[in-house]
From Swiss-Prot:
InterPro entries: ATP_synth_F0_gsu_mt (IPR006808). Mitochondrial membrane ATP synthase (F(1)F(0) ATP synthase or Complex V) produces ATP from ADP in the presence of a proton gradient across the membrane which is generated by electron transport complexes of the respiratory chain. F-type ATPases consist of two structural domains, F(1) - containing the extramembraneous catalytic core, and F(0) - containing the membrane proton channel, linked together by a central stalk and a peripheral stalk. During catalysis, ATP synthesis in the catalytic domain of F(1) is coupled via a rotary mechanism of the central stalk subunits to proton translocation. It comes from Caenorhabditis elegans. One of its GO terms (molecular function) is proton transmembrane transporter activity. Its main location: mitochondrion. Belongs to the ATPase g subunit family. Subunit of the F-type ATPase which has 2 components, CF(1) - the catalytic core - and CF(0) - the membrane proton channel. It is found in: Mitochondrion membrane. This is Probable ATP synthase subunit g 2, mitochondrial. PANTHER family: ATP SYNTHASE SUBUNIT. GO terms for cellular component: mitochondrial membrane; mitochondrion; non-motile cilium; proton-transporting ATP synthase complex.
Length: 131
């Protein structure tokens, strides 16, 4: 007896199951690698790292001041530009995460700052003295 021909969705289901079983078997190893890399890369700098950080920053400053960027190849320039843009974009993403809103800080419509309230009181006091 011949095996029945599988339909499109049955093939997709079988493929998805095979991928899931493979990924499920690989997960512990990959999670351990991710955890080790995250622990190393996301840790704040140690006291011993500061001299190297200062030296690297001095190199960047001298590179900019001496115009060393003019001698870069197109490829190097594009790579440095891409890295700089990535840092800037992640800064803005962090800002959005920090304020928990995409477009700006949520300020209530009836919010009045303390300095504005103080100014209004002063103006009302002056108006009362004039009358």
């Amino acid at each position: 007896m011949a095996a029945p021909k599988l339909g499109f969705f049955e093939k997709i289901a079988n493929l998805t199951g095979a991928l899931y079983r493979h990924q499920h078997a690989q997960f512990p190893r990959r999670f351990a690698i991710l955890k080790a890399v995250g622990k190393h890369e996301l840790a704040p700098p140690r006291q011993a790292d500061w001299p190297a950080i200062k030296a690297d920053w001095a190199k960047v400053q001298s590179f900019i001041q001496t115009g060393g960027y003019k001698n870069l190849s197109i490829r190097e320039g594009l790579v440095y530009t891409a890295v700089t843009l990535e840092v800037v974009f992640w800064f803005f993403v962090g800002e959005m995460i920090g304020r928990r809103y995409i477009f700006g800080y949520l300020v209530p419509a009836d919010y009045v700052s303390k300095s504005t309230k103080k100014t209004v009181k002063e103006q009302e006091a002056l108006a009362a003295l004039e009358n």
